[in-house]
Amino acid sequence: MCIRDRGYSVRNLKYMSKFASTYPDEQFVQTVSAQIPWSHNVAILDKVKGEKQREWYIRKTAENGWSHNVLIHQIESGLYERQAIADKISNFESRLASPQSELAVQTMKDPYIFDFIPFKEDMVERDIEQALVQDVTKLLLELGTGFAFLGNQYHLNVGGDDFYIDLLFYNLNLRCYVVIELKTGEFKPEYAGQLNFYLSAVDGILKKDNDNPSIGLLLCKSKNALVAEYALKDMSKPIGVSEYKVTSELPEALSKQLPSVEDIQKHIKRD
């Protein structure tokens, strides 16, 4: 019988052969790769080199329910390099109990890719903040699973004085508030002190008894790693420092290959 009579194209058979040689462990196939659709497995075979990387993307796809286009976006934006093996700067391990500290580190990325923000030379923090809020669907996709957006310029009244947080989230996996502050320039030590204060205020005003300690994330255009490490060393609250990139800073080939706004929004609505 012709192989096409059985519904298998030559291309599909080649992928099946490649799949079998790539994953010789039958138990891995049954318990891990079988959790995601065949088209997703094909995308990972095509685009991901290395056993650890492939397994990581398979597990993340199953965990997050990524569509085919979103999976490709995550691969081409280098999510494994930015989240799984990045040299992240934070004081989470010394300020949070286990396993909360490990989960917080795993959740963090460096850099964050805001490919939906058109770069302008005269952009200030508020411009970036507004652009992120306007496309909150894509912002949540980049931040990762479990994030719920609570507001921007979130007002806190502390002893009669007014303070405003750039972006406030609650993470359902971490079970804590996440305060994000945006900076258009290089990291400065005083930014950590300001965020430390905001976290104290959030813990005092918003945090409930069953919530974990709030976490802060400083997103800067650039950072001196050693300066950031020293700045966080004596901060009392858990804080991470990451860089971010916008559209004009991405390689042209990558920018062309990213999924459309419609693709991402359809995926989020479907979930």
Give the residues covered by each predicted segment.
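Basic, low-complexity intrinsically disordered segments
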Residues: 4-271
